[in-house]
Structure formats: structure tokens, C-alpha cells
Amino acid sequence: MNITVYLGANEGSDPALAAAVRELGSWIGANGHHLVYGGSRSGLMGLLAQSALDAGGTVTGVEPQFFIQQELQHDGLTELIVTRDMAERKTKMIELGDAFIAFPGGTGTLEEIAEVMSRVSLGQLDAPCILYDLNGYYDSLKALLDKMIEKGLSTPQRQRGIRFVANLEEITTILNKA
């Protein structure tokens, strides 16, 4: 299974985040899955890729040209796909993925997973869309989605493919059913 993971190029301030990233990367690699991610060697992105590689996995990085020019790419990847810009990167990462996971991240992570959430809710993408709600990070987003339903702006049916999870065990349960 190709698992696209969205997460930041920063490390964040919560040590539990780095531990969870390592755990997921190792699980992907050890279980014969293929990681698709943003291609950077920095922060959580680099940690995820290296964990998957160290566990024997294969990894595709998808990185826009302007990051290549800044020499931010991970040099040990199985494959590096260079895109013109962020929009093309986002499209390519969706094309390559069979399942999608968003770790806590910044505005880029939010933008990327929002595109997946939209496609899933519109029926244009039939794949797990998982938000890793580590230590309640995505609680406010979950509340917003619930508010959309409450106000008649969305439906439970449209949001049924969007899943919030608290740990790797919940992720693996979802992916094993996909």
C-alpha cells in the first residue's frame, strides 16, 4: 500500500510527536508498505523517511523545484519526484497515495490534508483520510467539522471517510481494512 503522509519540516515542541513519527515510519517500512511524503530531510519529514528506510521500506519524496534549489531534499530516498510548484506536488502526492495520514503540522500540512478531505467528502477519492490527533492536536478541526454538520453545511455521510485517531494501533486498524 502506498501511504501518503503529510507533516512538517519542523520538529515541533512536543517530544511525543517525534516518537509517533518514528513509530509510524518504522511500521510502514517493516510491513512492506511504501511511504510517499514531501521529500525533505528536515524536521519531522526527514525523521519519518529515515525511520521507514531504516526499517527496510521504500520511500518516494515529492518536492517542488524551489526546495531542490535550497538543497532540502533527503538524499537517501528510493525515488525523488521534482514538481514545478506546491500545487503540482499536492496533486502528485494524491495520485500516488492509497491512504492519507496527516500528523500535526503547520499551514502546509493543513492545506494538503484539506484537499484530501474535500476529495473524499465529494466521492472523488475512495481512500482512508486519517488525521493523527496526537494529544488532541486536531480537536478544534474535528469540532469545526461537527459544526458544519450541525449547521447543515455538511453531512455525516460526506465526512464518514475522514477519521481522527489517537495512536498507531487505530491507524493500522483502518489501513488493514482498506
Where are these regions (language model features)?
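A cross-family phosphate/adenosyl-ligand binding-site feature
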Residues: 1-96, 134-178
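Arginine/glycine-rich "motif VI" loop of SF2 helicases in the C-terminal RecA-like domain
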Residues: 53, 120-127, 153-154
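Short loop-to-beta-strand entry elements in the cores of soluble alpha/beta enzymes
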Residues: 127-135
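Active-site/ligand-binding-proximal alpha/beta "capping" segment
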Residues: 90-122, 130
